[in-house]
Amino acid sequence: MIYLDTSVALLSLLGQPGADETARLIMDAHATEGLISSCLLTVEMARAAHREHFDICVVDEFIAGVELVEIGPDVIERASTLTGELKSLDAIHLATATLLDNPRHPVTVLTHDARLADAARSRGLGAINPLDS
């Protein structure tokens, strides 16, 4: 299962260096394993659309291909233990990913954030930074 962090989603939409490789990884994951993320992705991407002046419809189309997970009490509790090493929103993403991880469906975090990738790996999750490919 591929957990999509906002940093990678935005990289693919904003046409930044590495956007083509990132878009390819996202499309491959969508076709083979599926994409999952916290519903926080919606808020962060809408904010970026406003900040970067691009059409919110692009965000809506992108998010339509991602299974979104609610931020429940279990996510908040887990994220609270991660805020010493991560920013709050990254802690919510990592908490969500760790709660989804299981032996039958291991989670790999797709992120452009080195600190989040390291934190994911230290908790037994896979992590891919498309710019390292």
Each language-model region and where it sits:
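Short, well-structured N-terminal submotif of metal-dependent ribonuclease cores
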Residues: 1-37, 48-61, 125, 131-133
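Acidic, PIN/NYN-like endoribonuclease modules and their adjacent C-terminal/linker elements
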Residues: 1, 38, 42, 98-133
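His/Asp/Glu-enriched, well-ordered alpha-helical/loop segment
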Residues: 45
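Acidic catalytic patch
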Residues: 64-96, 100
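Short active-site oxyanion
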Residues: 31-35, 65-67, 104-108
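Alpha-helical scaffold domains
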Residues: 58, 68, 76, 81, ...
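A general structural signal for well-ordered alpha-helical segments in protein cores
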Residues: 19, 42, 56-59, 76, ...
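Short beta-strand scaffold positions
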Residues: 4, 37, 70, 88-91, ...
